[in-house]
Amino acid sequence: MAQQRKLGLPTDHRRAMLRNLVTSFLKNGKVETTITRAKEARNMAEKMITLAKRGDLHARRQVLAYVTEKEVVDHLFAEIAPKYADRNGGYTRMYKMGPRRGDGAEVVILELV
């Protein structure tokens, strides 16, 4: 099984943070966060888009189990998934924004292609 980054958080906090980050990303089309969080969120967001491309009821229920808002799931299935119907992965891109003032953490913008 694939190794996940721990992000310096307890398991429940990390899972909740990633679910919220992916939900926000799918809702707005882009999100600004640290590079390690963006890499983890990108993995899950791409899995959610791939599931949405299937478009069946089971895929919708699997996405609903991870994404926290029903409106975002509807948007994912109705608008985002058809946009990537002919693309096999690589739905996101990351732009480095440089170090964050205050703690120097490397910040990136994660966005849909």
Curated annotation (Swiss-Prot):
Top-rank lineage group of the source organism: Bacteria
Keywords on record: Ribonucleoprotein, Ribosomal protein
GO molecular function, one term: structural constituent of ribosome
Disulfide bond sites: none
GO cellular component annotations of the record: cytosolic large ribosomal subunit
A single BP term in Gene Ontology: translation
The protein's assembly and partners: Part of the 50S ribosomal subunit. Contacts protein L32.
Family in the record: Belongs to the bacterial ribosomal protein bL17 family.
Protein name according to UniProt: Large ribosomal subunit protein bL17
